[in-house]
Structures are given as structure tokens and as C-alpha cells.
Amino acid sequence: MRTHGSSMRIPCSRVSGRKRFYALVSTPLFSLLFFVAAITLQNSYAQPNVGDDSTVVYPASYFAEWAPVTAQDMLNRIPGMQRSSGSNRGGSFRNASRGGRGLGSGSSGTQILINDKRTPGKNNNSQTQLTRIDAEQVEYIEIIRSTSGDLDVRGSTQIANIVLYEVLSTTTLNYEASADYYQDSKSEPGGSLTYGGQAGNLNFLLNASATPQYIHRVVSEDSILPDMSANDYIHQDRIREQTTYVLSTNLDYQISEKSSARFNALFTEGDNPMTVDRLTVDLRNNGFLPSWEREDTPGTMNNWEVGGDYEFRRDNGDRFKVLFIANETDTANTRERWDVFGDGTEEKNLFLDSFSVIEERIVRGSYTMDVFDGQSIEFGAERAQTILDSSLLLGIASLTGTPSADHGGLTAVNVPNANTRVEEVRYEPFAIHNWRINPRMSVETSMVYEFSEIEQSGDFNNSRDFSFFKPKIDYRFDITPRLQLRFLIEKFVRQLSFTDFVASTDSQDDDTNTLAGNRNLRPDFWWNYNFLAEYRLPNDTGVVSANIYKHRHKDYLQRIDVSSAEGEVKSATGNIGNSEMWVFDLKGSVRLSMFNLPNVLVTGSVNLTDSEVADPFLGITRRFNNLGRGSINLGFRHDIPRWRMNYGVSMRNRIDGATKLWDIDDIEEDHGDPYFNGFLEFIAFDDVTFRFDARDMTNVDTCRDRSRYVGHIADNVLEEIEYMCASMGTTVSLRVSGTF
């Protein structure tokens, strides 16, 4: 709740981000981690080597003792490849309006291929198929750590290639029934059916699923005035009722020995109505004055996607490939708020209606050919069209205005840039050269030229052109088949978020109804300097990696001042100039074979992050918005094959103290306790799998401290300080799955 206050000094740090980062890396914690890693490496060299190729192959027999059900279960048993089998199996909405438009040739991290191919989809991709592929269909899994012109993706740290058996005819039907139980005694059912197999030259996969995503968030907030006296207390119950329904199919047809085609389709529906009950107690002047509000926000969301590709190989090994993807995401919600009085009567005070449609169309073609011994080149082009249509209606209670039926019976408020269409057409011709210098060294060089046109129409009309040259060099050196060094230099252009162009709702601040848009945005870009070292321990004991990289940003995007001439203080996303970021990642995934516990897999990671940017409001040097100091993650998985059981616990803990959001009239800082998940899984009754999951086992509070200022933050007039904490409680789920 806003009140007026007095002046208070804003803390300012002038310490160089680079010095802070180097200081963090040299802490005793990292000294200990490097010592442990060094001892591990020293001992492992005395053990026998496993081969002369950096690619690691895991045949189906490797996984037999763990009785996996899906391809994801198999991948989870490989050190360094863990992903929760109990994670959301429903569809996800990858919002093209927020960046990530187009497809490209791949990305960093671990990429998934199925039978050497990338699925031509974004929401329905190879990663989402892993929980749908029956383990009995998998012949072997390759972990590919090198680069090659034969691969379907480029630039990945490593690739997991799931290779399926080639049989004339086989089918399987996988089922899963689930029930989630929440801390407020609410329960929600879910489940999925997957029918897949091979018929002649056709591989097929059909899936239908329903995934509960119910959330009950309890929020408590205390605030104080500049003189440290009590201001108010707020308690909220925020409930979102959502179940995501997904229908999808993936088809792979081998037309001949030289040609093949793939097709996939997906439809997702995830209506997400929300209700809020809010109690506010005014504590000023030693008072105790309660008031009540309630909100009702019916929401709808659906997404569809189709994609396909065709590949033809010539007799000389050259390869031609063309693919297409089309998708659309529709979202709509209407937020209404009422004052609730002691006698049970209500009075509406807010109407906020938003609607958006995002469409994306992608076509990409390429030709790959060998040019010299050990060298290949791929050249081609990609065209991507993205369209956002959005509208926003705001109505408030007013004694003088004219009620409007379109605004919920309240007085209409003019919101600039509220009805807008944004369209981008982007072209990317590219050439990728891959050179296997010798059995231990490879280098991949890519040259991409991006040019695009962004047009905005509606409340404002604007059209601009952009062009960027994006080179990349990826060098890999296998010192041994186990130890690999990677050096990467690339220029990365971040695609603009279309939602930053237009006015939108503010779901993070009850005192602010809408966020302003900025129609003059430019894409920001950075140079990425990346060094990675990875060591795979002998005898499949595990993998340890260290990664350090630096980003040098140009035209970096943060909040900027867009206040109106009438004196209304406003901010929006905008370009602010140059900035830098440093990141250090240390990861490990190790079997406890040295303690005679080979079926216990321990995973851990430490991430340290620092950044430096000139704040556009205060002129001080600070970290990036919402980018903290890093995180520490730990977990283990224990398989007991003789009991056909496994269990595990994972912890995620961010390093608090610097996760801040600087805006034109407030400063927010987030912090929270470690977050724990656990699971128990066993197989019984003729290969039926039972899995119990507990999410947020300790009922963690995530907290935010917000300092609000009267007017512009540079005026340094403190209004209030808010201390908010929220929790969603422990969720327990049971999943029963099997195969027919």
C-alpha cells in the first residue's frame, strides 16, 4: 500500500564486477572443489582407458538391471544426463513473442536426437518425446561430444542420440495414471496414454495427456514507513486451477535408402482461471483497520503446432534437407477486483482484460557436402515470420467517469499502446564449416547473416530494419578420449520480446495495473567468450566439467524512464548501452563406486555469476536485474536392482544477496531457502511402476523485500519498505505406469 514518506539514502556499490567475480572464484569453497577434482583426476589416470573415441555408447543391455520403462529412465542412469522422470509430461508453451523465435541450427547445452534426427518442432520436440518412447524400443544411446557435419544440430556442448531398433513391426501402449495431493487438501487427477511402434518403414508415436498444474500460493506481507513505524499487513490466498491437456503425434517415414521424412503435430489446452482473496490491515498510527478484496481472473490458453522435414542423401554422401514449422498460441484473461464490505456487499474497483495471439511460421533449407578430407560445409537459409496481436482494456471505479459495458461497467482508462500488432519477418542465410583436423581436434566455424524487418501497427505505426553478422568458432581438443577442452567465441543477437513493445498487465505488483510498452526497442547482442573442460571418469564412474565464460553486451536491455510530459512516472524495457557478465559453472555427476556403492549416483553443481551495468535511473554501477550471485544444487539417486526400486533427493539453492530488480520508483530484492524434492519408485505386479514424488518437501518461503519511493527513485524520497514471503506448500503425487 502506497503512503508518503521522507528521504533515505540509496546504497551504492562501486566495486568492480570483475574483482567481485574473481574474489568469489577464489573462495575456500572453490579451493576445496578443485582439490577434490584434482584428486579424482589423479587417481583415475591409473585406471584403464575405455577407447579412442570421445563418443560414449550405452547399449540397451547396460540399462537392463534398472528395468527402465521409458527412454528418459535410461538417460537418467547416465552420469551427467539426469532429468526428472516425474517432471511435467504435459505440453509447454514456448512463447515466441518473448524471444526464441525461429529454429536455428541448435543451441548450447545438451541436445536430443532420435535416430540421428532432430524433431522439427519447438513445443513438440525431441526432448518431450523421451518420456513417450518405450525403453524396449531403444537399441543404444550415444553421448556425442564432438562436432561433425553429419549431425543434425550444431553448437551443442554434447548430444544424446537415442537410436531405436529397426524391426519390421512392433507396437507398445504405455499408460500412466496420476494423482497430485496439495497442502490445502486439494487433489487433482492426471494421466497419459502413448501408443507407439514401427510398421514397416514408419515409426510412429501418438500421445494424449492431462497434467494437473494447480497452485495455491499463500502470501503474507508486512510494510513499514520511513520512520520504521508499522504501515500495514496484507494476507493473500492466490489459487490457480489449471490442467493442461495435450494431444500430439510424431511420425518418421523412411521413404527409401536415400530419403526420409518426419512430421509432428501438437495441440495443447491449458485454461488457467485464478482467484485471489486479500485481507489488508491498516496499522498506521497504532490503528487496526481491516479491509477485504477479492479477485476473479478467468483465463484461457491454447497452442497448436505442426512441423515436418524431408531429407535426401545423394550417392556421394551430400545431404539436402528442408523443414517447416507453424504454431500459434492464444491467451486471454479478464481480471476483475471487488471491495468486500462487512455486510457481505461488494463493489467492483478494477477491470483488466487482455488478449493476445502469437503466430510463427518457419521454413529452413540446407545442403551439406564434403569439400576436403575431414571437412564438410553446410549452407542454406531460414525464414521466420512472427506476428503478435494484442489488446488491453482497463476500467477503474470513478465517481465522475461514464461507465462502459466493454470495461466491466467501470470507467474506461486510456492505455497507450494497448491495441497493437507487431510483425517480424527475419531471414538468416548461413554457412557452417566443419573440420576434423585429426582424431583429437575439430573446429566448427559458422557465419550467419541476420536481417529482419519489424512493423508495428494499431495505436502506433512504426517500421524498422535490422541486420547483424553473427560469426562463431567452436574448437574442441580431446587431450584423451576422456578429457576434452572446448573454446568457443560467438556473437549472439537476442531477439526482441514482442511483449516489451506493447502495454501489458503487471502480475507482480498489486499497486500497478499495467506496464508500458516501448516501440523503439533495438535488439541487444553480445560476444560470448567460453572455455569448457570436461572429464569422464573411467569405468563409467561419472563426469566432471568446469565452464567459465564472459559476455560483453551492446545495447543491453533493462528498465528505462519513459515518463510522460504530464509528469506521470513510468518505466519500460529499453536499451541502455554496454554491460558485462561473468559466469563460472562447476558440475559433477559421480557414482560412489569407490565406496562399493556403484548404484548411488551423486550430482552437484555450483554456479557463480557476476555482472556490471550502469543504472539508467541513478547512474550507479550495479548488477543486472534479477541476476543473482549464482546457485548450488545437490542430489543423489540410489538404485536397488534386486528390489527393483530407486529413490532420490535433490536440492536447489540460490546464493542470496544480489537478486535485485531496479525500477524507476522501487528496488526489489528476492531471497529464499533451499528447495528440496524427493521421489521413491519401484516396480511390482508384473512390471507396473509406482512412483511417489514430494515437491517442496520443506514448504519453502520465497521472499521479496521492496523499497518504494515517491516519484522518481533519483529524488530519493522513501515511501515504504515491504517484506513479503510466499509459499505453495508440499505437493505429493502418485504415478502408476506400465506397458501393454
Predicted regions and their residues:
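Transmembrane beta-barrel wall of Gram-negative outer-membrane proteins
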Residues: Q183-V218, S229-V276, P298-R314, I473
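Extracytoplasmic beta-strand/coil segments of soluble accessory domains associated
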Residues: N49, V56, Q72-K122
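Membrane-embedded beta-barrel scaffold of Gram-negative outer-membrane proteins
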Residues: K321, Q385-I387, Q484-E490, R494, ...
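N-terminal periplasmic accessory domains that precede
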Residues: A71-M74, G100-R101, I112-N115, T128-Q129, ...
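A beta-strand signature from Gram-negative outer-membrane beta-barrel systems
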Residues: A135-T172, T739
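C-terminal beta-signal and adjacent terminal beta-strands/loops
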Residues: I655-A658, F682-F740
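Gram-negative outer-membrane beta-barrel transporters
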Residues: Y549-R552, K570-A658
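Short acidic/polar hinge/loop motifs at secondary-structure boundaries
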Residues: R118-R145, L193
